[in-house]
Regions:
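ATP-dependent carbohydrate kinase catalytic cores
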Residues: 1-96, 106, 123, 129-136, ...
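Generic, well-ordered alpha-helical scaffold segments in large soluble proteins
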Residues: 3-4, 28, 32, 114, ...
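Alpha-helical hydrophobic/aromatic positions enriched in membrane-embedded helices and signal peptides
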Residues: 38-39, 60, 101, 184, ...
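Short glycine/serine/threonine-biased micro-segments
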Residues: 42, 59, 66-67, 95, ...
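Short, well-ordered loop/turn and helix-capping segments at boundaries between secondary-structure elements
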Residues: 58-59, 79, 117-124, 196, ...
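A conserved active-site cap/scaffold subdomain adjacent to cofactor or substrate pockets
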Residues: 96-123
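Activation-segment/catalytic-loop signature of the eukaryotic protein kinase fold
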Residues: 143-239
Length: 239
């Protein structure tokens, strides 16, 4: 810390496990959150690691993808992984025995939203009039397009990319456009691109960690049955 110029005073007073009780809920806080005063407060953990635990991951080899604006995919294992493109930390359960390694794709749910906001005015108007989700309408059209989007390929690096590329200057690309392609083709290719980004992370991990099946997915992406099927097809794994 001296070499990096970080004052020791900024560090926590002590290191604790995620399950350690570090305090009690005050009366004021209890009123705000609807819990009892004095409720034990645990140290907790990083957001996606706790989401992994909440998905029921307790054993080595189990893995979860948290898919919202971006992707965070992580696996529980023992020992240090061979692939150093992943980020590794103690797992929230049995932290002395188990590790959690993860990689992330920067752009996931942000891509369908970008497409909808810029190219789906008709679907948004229908949503306002009928209450039907504009994303659901886009899914219906994209489901009619064959896997592979008739040769259309999207690289989903619209906000740079994290694991395993780690390049903030990577940029999104739409390849193979022809006059045959429609809006539905582009939307499906976007969904497929995120699935392949997840597969890229998983394949980078498989060099040193034995992965189990299925892959559990949590987050907003799970609202789309089409997208979940695309993930299953691309990963070759039950979801």
């Amino acid at each position: 810390m001296e070499e990096m110029g970080i004052p020791v005073e900024l560090m926590p007073e002590r290191l604790v496990s995620s399950s350690d009780v570090v305090g009690r809920l005050t009366a004021e806080a209890a009123t705000r959150v609807g819990l009892l005063a004095g409720t034990p407060v645990c140290a907790g953990g990083v957001d996606c690691v706790v989401a992994t635990l909440s998905a029921g991951v307790l054993e080595t080899g189990q893995h979860v993808a948290v898919i919202g604006t971006s992707v965070n995919w992580g696996v529980v294992h023992e020992g240090f992984p061979k692939n150093r493109t992943l980020v590794t930390m103690p797992y929230v359960k049995e932290p002395l025995e188990k590790c959690y390694s993860y990689g992330g794709a920067s752009t996931a749910g942000a891509l369908p939203r970008w497409f909808r906001d810029n190219f789906a005015e008709r679907e948004k108007e229908a949503e306002s009039a009928t209450g039907q989700s504009s994303y659901a309408a886009l899914d219906v059209a994209a489901a009619r397009i064959p896997a592979g989007s008739d040769g259309l390929l999207v690289l989903p690096y619209f906000m740079g990319e994290r694991c395993p590329i780690w390049d903030v200057n990577a940029r999104g690309t739409i390849l193979g456009l022809t006059l045959h392609h429609s809006k539905a083709h582009v939307y499906r290719a976007i969904l497929e691109s995120v699935a392949y980004a997840l597969r890229h992370i998983v394949e980078a991990t498989e060099t040193g960690i034995q992965l189990g099946k299925p892959c559990t997915i949590v987050g907003g992406a799970t609202k789309s049955r089409l997208w979940m099927q695309i993930f299953a097809d691309v990963l070759g794994s039950p979801i």
